[in-house]
Amino acid sequence: MVAFDANEALTPCREGRGIGAILFDRERLRQAEVGLFSPQHWGSKARPVGEGGRGSAWFIDAPFGASVLRHYLRGGLAAKISHDQYLWRGSDRTRSFAEFRLMRALREKKLPVPRPIAAYYMREGLRYRAAILMERIEGVRSLADRALVAGRGAPWEETGRLIARFHRAGLDHADLNAHNILFDGNGHGWLIDFDRGVIRIPATAWRERNLKRLLRSLIKLRGERSVEDVQKDYARLRRAYDMAWNRGT
């Protein structure tokens, strides 16, 4: 867990029978309230994010800047039991607070990630719901989109070097897929979606697990491209990753 600092503010909140809290960046928000985490609150200023995810994210045109709101939803078999509720294990272990603080820690390491603005949870009994609000990186396209459009011309080497940089800092990304890697027109890259991610001592096992997950997503999202073409492009990514890792950059 990242230590609390002077730029964080924490305020309690209530919603119906729920009791919760909001963790926010005091440099971006003077105060925070539950409405920040509702797309209905923003009205026409909220637009659904179309790519990736489970329909749980919105672009927000907020007075404090272009932002992204994301609700935490469960996937797989767990979603059949409850699509948006998680077992309560304490505020510091909520998905939203953990991701907020992880993103802040990555930014402190000078890594290219969105700035977290606010995170909240709402608890009822032994269950809670959560959401996070972060800055939007504008003028970018995902690796998934770039691969479909540009194929071999997509930023494969840049992606390999970008991932190596995060791995060198100890980031074990829980969902490293082609939707969560973004590039702008100048070739600058970012990673997004750090839910369930952790900072740990760099080790081969989890680094390889991240990379294999990315390859699976590239194959799944390949469109009309052949698996062989995707594997060739991934080989370029992997060579660049290995070179950057071995150089310590």
Swiss-Prot record:
Its protein name is 3-deoxy-D-manno-octulosonic acid kinase
Question: What family is this?
Answer: Belongs to the protein kinase superfamily. KdkA/RfaP family.
Known role:
Catalyzes the ATP-dependent phosphorylation of the 3-deoxy-D-manno-octulosonic acid (Kdo) residue in Kdo-lipid IV(A) at the 4-OH position.
Q: What terms describe the molecular function in GO for this protein?
A: ATP binding; protein kinase activity
Q: Where is the active site?
A: 175
* GO-annotated cellular components: cytosol; plasma membrane; preribosome, small subunit precursor
EC main group: transferase
Which EC numbers does the record give?
Answer: 2.7.1.166
Primary location group: membrane
* Domain of life from the UniProt record: Bacteria
Q: Where in the cell is it found?
A: Cell inner membrane
Specify the protein's topology with respect to the membrane. Peripheral membrane protein
Task: Please name the Pfam families in this protein's record.
Answer: Kdo
GO biological process terms, semicolon-separated: lipopolysaccharide core region biosynthetic process; maturation of SSU-rRNA
